[in-house]
Amino acid sequence: MSTAAAITRRNFLRISALTPLAAATSSKAFAPIQRTGGPFFTPTLNAYSFLEQLNANLADPTKGIDLFGVVDFCVKNNILAVDLTGYFFPGYPKAPADSYLNRIKRYTHDRGITISGTGVKNDFTTADKAVRAEGVTLTKLWIEVAARLGAPVVRVFAGPQQKNPKDWQGAAGGASRDEVEKWMADSLRECAEHGGKFGVIVAVQNHGDFISTGPEHISLLKRIDHEWCGALVDTGKYFTDDPYADIAVMVPHAVNWQVKETLGSSLKTPRTDFKTLAKIIHDGGYRGFVPIETLAMGRKDYNPAAEVEMVLKGMREAIAALD
């Protein structure tokens, strides 16, 4: 066992010890996902990697790239699935026209690409009940959009991303963490209940906000306690001394992923060790798509196509080495 692996294992055991009640007292709704057949996963794409180009196209259709262009990128690189972030659909936050949904569904199908998910912008951290209610309404709407697309997952946030993970306290109006988690869980449970009616899972992302550690992620999911709610594991947003340990704790609850090129979504943090990450995902028994989401991180020369291809190569090689 390598030194890094040994450290991660020790921290995994430490983090697991912090959440004993999650395993001991919750209902059957909150439990490790029952997967059969052994681990089997492949790196895919989250469209957000092309953020700047997609936004440019929304502002001026003659510029940048649209979602159809993102699908073409998947074809070029033999990527089997794409997570089509809601923000990049025309008219967001409104539901796209049926004609547009039908076009993108047919376009992906004809090219052998699966639409693996979508996502919205919401704020369930705020003390403002009206804003939370708007987030529930938005999430429910996009659950229905996801169902139309044939996408099994809608990604949601705990709240808006903060420069400092502790800044959520300001948005929460001074409420305690327990109180915020309660009202957040109430909102997410309502969304998950709606998701169950449409066969769409609500995936809560750790986004460097209210959810910045594995134990925080587990605690919220336990409180939501709904079979149609799970974790979107963002490998670049567990702000701890050993993010790999947090990732390992979350694999049994993962319903979607965002694989980042660095561990802290910043050029100041270590590059992701894809071999370590792949082994953690494998050892956790995960089956399914593992979308890559790269970030500009302030780089003026950021090339999303090249960055995604770099991470894709690293993940594919790491997975192949597991055999």
Pin down the residues of each PLM region.
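Non-cysteine beta-strand/loop elements that form the S-adenosyl-L-methionine
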Residues: 45-46, 156, 253-261, 292
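Active-site groove signature of glycoside hydrolases
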Residues: 146-170, 198-207
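A short helix->loop->beta-strand "cap" motif at the edges of active sites that frequently abuts
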Residues: 113, 200, 284-288
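Active-site clefts of carbohydrate-active enzymes
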Residues: 260-266, 289-302
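Acidic/histidine-rich catalytic cores of soluble enzymes
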Residues: 82, 181, 185-280
